[in-house]
Design a protein with these regions (language model features):
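Secondary-structure boundary/capping positions in well-ordered alpha/beta enzyme cores
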Residues: 72-73, 131, 160, 182, ...
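Alpha-helical structural signal in soluble globular domains
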Residues: 36, 60, 64-69, 93, ...
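Glycine-rich phosphate-binding "P-loop"
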Residues: 136, 158-159, 268-269
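C-terminal alpha-helical cap/extension of soluble enzyme domains
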Residues: 7-15, 32, 36-37, 93, ...
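Active-site beta->alpha loop and helix N-cap motifs at the rims of alpha/beta catalytic domains
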Residues: 2-142
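Catalytic alpha/beta core domains of metabolic enzymes, predominantly
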Residues: 126, 141-245
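A general structural signal for well-ordered alpha-helical segments in protein cores
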Residues: 5, 26, 58, 62, ...
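Short secondary-structure transition/capping segments
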Residues: 53-56, 89, 114-117, 145-147, ...
């Protein structure tokens, strides 16, 4: 099986008005990403505030993404939760809409075991007929997919990849050792993009690519031919990545999507916007990177 995508996928933000999703600006943002070399659109994930979207909103967002993509780049739906039954229902609905794949997070709060992870992911994978990327982000879930667990899960024909947001490249090496080359690894940490690529990562599901899609894709392509030049690109992008870590994702990145005109600066409770001084700092770093051209 070929990989669902290689290169840079955008973990897309969801623009809001004060009380609703701004579908028009969502469409505009996706069009911008598609026109600037993004290789995949990941919708309703962490960055998209999927945990505070209604089922109707999630389906509407996926429909817009599918219209914009028009079959040219994969649309991947975030459908995971800590409720296996609910994850199956969301996954089936997304599949019916025509998405290309699913991003399914490890269950949080319940504190299951590694055996529980195998049962959870396998049950979801059995219920659909499209590719699944597992999503390991222990900072948000409190648990990690261990190599022995991944080795079992990777045998399922619908489980084709892993988004590794552990921030641990040694752990990545252990995971890579237990699967074959057809299994894809996608980075989930923008600050580790270059070493992740150099270690054989197939791509990155990126937050910063919401506003720097072509720059990140260029870095990915350059790694394969000139690691020193790729490192220069990585270092140029790093100040933006660093300033986007001043608060929990997606609070900072939405400052920049709003700055570029893709909706108001709104996040949904329990998230709250940054203070104006911090917003200004983010914009200043971004403008410096872009040479004041924005």
């Amino acid at each position: 099986m070929s990989h669902l995508f290689t290169g840079i996928g955008a973990a897309v933000t969801t623009p809001f008005t004060e009380d609703a999703v701004d579908y028009e600006q969502f469409r505009n943002h996706l069009t911008f990403l598609k026109d600037n070399q993004i290789q995949s659109l990941i919708v309703n994930g962490t960055t998209g505030e999927g945990s505070t979207l209604s089922t109707e909103e999630k389906m509407n967002l996926l429909n817009v993404a599918l219209e914009v993509s028009d079959g040219q780049i994969p649309v991947i739906a975030g459908t995971g939760s800590n409720n296996t039954k609910a994850s199956i229902e969301a996954s089936k609905k997304a599949e019916e809409l025509g998405v290309d794949g699913l991003l399914v997070i490890t269950p949080y709060y319940n504190k299951t075991s590694q055996r529980g992870l195998v049962a959870h992911f396998t049950t979801i994978a059995d219920a659909v007929n499209i590719p699944i990327i597992l999503y390991d982000v222990p900072a948000r879930t409190g648990m990690t997919i261990e190599p022995e667990t991944l080795q079992i899960l990777a045998e399922h024909p619908n489980i084709v990849g892993l988004k590794d947001a552990t921030g641990d490249l040694t752990h990545l090496s252990r995971l890579q050792a237990v699967v074959n080359d057809s299994f894809a690894f996608y980075g989930g940490n923008d600050d580790l993009a270059l070493p992740f690529f150099a270690q054989g990562g197939h791509g990155l599901i990126s937050v910063a690519a919401n506003v720097l899609p072509s720059e990140y894709q260029l870095m990915f392509e350059t790694v394969k031919i000139d690691i020193a030049k790729a490192n220069l690109i990585y270092r140029e992008l790093h100040p933006v990545v660093e300033v986007l870590s001043i608060d929990v994702n997606p609070i900072p990145i939405k400052v920049l999507t709003s700055f570029l005109g893709f909706g108001q600066y709104e996040v949904r409770l329990p998230l709250v916007p940054l203070e104006e001084m911090d917003q200004a700092s983010i914009i200043e770093v971004f403008r410096h990177l872009k040479g004041e051209s924005v």
